[in-house]
Amino acid sequence: MGQLMYCRRIVRCVAGLSMLRYVTVFAGLFVLAACSRDAAAPEDGATPLRVRLLTGEQYLNTVASIFGEDVAASVTPPTPPLTRTDGLLASGAASVGVTSDQVSQIQQAAQFIAARVLDEEHRDFLVPCEPASDLEPDPTCAGQFLRETGRLLYRRPVEETRVAELVDVAGRAAEQAGSFYDGLALALEAILISPEVLFIVDEAEPDPDNPGRERLTGYSLASRLSYFLWNAPPDDELLQAAESGELHTREGLARAVDRMLSSSRLEDGMRAFFDDMLAFDDFNSLAKDPMVYPMVTGATLADAREQTLRTILDHLLDKERDYRDLFTTRDTWMSMPLAAVYGLPTENGWVPYTFPDDSHREGLLTHISFLAANSHSVRSSPTLRGKALRELFLCQKVPDPPPNVDFSALEEAGDVPTARERLQVHNSNPSCAGCHLITDPMGLSLENFDGAGRFRETENGVELDISGELDGIFYDDVHGLTAAMRDHPKLSACLVNRLYAYGTGGPVELRYDRDALARFTTRFAEQGHKLPELLRDLALSEAFTRVRPPESPEESVVNAAEPPQSQIASTTR
């Protein structure tokens, strides 16, 4: 057993060096690709080659898809914190890597997964063959398992030289441990800590139909499609389509995309996207003061997050309704913890619910998830709500406050009864007024809802004025705000922007992507703002499948080499 531990240390050492060196390998590949291309101008809407880390959820989904939910259930994803980039954590995955401490976490997770896969409970249905002896190496059986499992984990076929190396690792470890399955576990661990498993690596090839242009390889396209639509790795059928070349034909790609869109796994993929787009990761640390809002518990906030996701998925996927109507619909879902905050009677579990016509609730902006997440722990915040409205749904970045702002005047206004009066302080300060004028008029229209999202008509005994304005549209109440939001010209364009960035693995670059995004937005409107149609348009587009060359080989080296070692430091400080 001591010698087996020595073998494990050798495997981990080699994998650790691979983790630190892999960027050099990929950088070299990118440079060679750049040198092999002609000097044609970048393809309109095409994306750069990217190397992006699997998110924590994608890591767990990968394990679950290949080995089963029960194996994944006890795994802590060994992924570093991600920085939200242009509104998405998923885009931040293209600019983050791993530190030496995280390499250790990756190794621990791999050891746990490998041990579970090959224990007596799982080996009989996860290993496709039976060894000649449980006590000795069996190169044939080991090779079959490692070849088939490696193909799913690497998301492409495993080169035979690599299979031979892994079989050798399994054989040597089996001899030392006196166990075929212990040896196989060590070889599986070596795969699981491979950078090619932990990172989604775009690879390009010349496009024979467009000389001088490049496209994603079939396997890279399969990964892009599956993590976009399913938030999970390609299944066997999608890998077969990549291997046969079907994904590089219009008919074959359309068949694959239509199959994925009709799968129940699409709901998982879109749940992950909207959870990211709405910054619902903030709920992981969100809390309300129990003295002020005793009815709001961790379970309440978790249900608030779930309510909005259920509403979105039911509206867009199950009923295939207009995306814009999410901001005016009265249809939602309700649970008992939420009903206490909404002031409604309800049953146990989740039930569909429609707010009556005379209710002040309509659309996502009146959900507890939006109202509570964008408030302080003891009170509402028109500024936070207006900022979130613009950034989440209109893709308009609101600047942070200047570092030298004096908040003393606002603090001294504590005896002023309403938020509208308190915020007049900002409007009298030139360094504050500019930003507050683009956030507060909309946020004040939501002051009928307190910091927990409960409806109210007064604040500190004073009747609330909830009139407001959104980009030239004036209204008297929250219904006017939701209508103005539904019809805002930037609303649909923002969803297109976010989906394109999410699907292609990094933030959009308007100098390259502007025309493609405009075309997608126009088509989205022509098709009634239906999400499945938009997803299909994106996935079948040349912009999604084409690759543009870097502006210089040096740019390729920097982009490929930074994530694993340098940029992670900035995300953890």
PLM regions and their residue ranges:
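Short, functional "switch" segments adjacent to catalytic/cofactor/reactive centers
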Residues: S91-R147, E447-A493, N497
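Bacterial N-terminal signal peptides that target proteins for export
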Residues: L4-V25
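Extended surface/linker regions that mediate inter-domain or inter-protein docking
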Residues: I113, E136, T140-C141, T149, ...
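C-terminal motif of bacterial Sec signal peptides marking the signal peptidase cleavage site
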Residues: L32-A34
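A conserved hydrophobic secondary-structure block that centers on an alpha-helix together
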Residues: E136-A187, P195, P208
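Extended, well-ordered alpha-helical scaffold/bundle regions in very large, multi-domain proteins
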Residues: R213-A222, Y227-A272, A287-K288
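Sequence context surrounding c-type heme c attachment/ligation sites in exported
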Residues: S36, A339, P352-V478, T482-A493, ...
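Bacterial Sec signal peptide processing site at the extreme N-terminus
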Residues: S36-G45
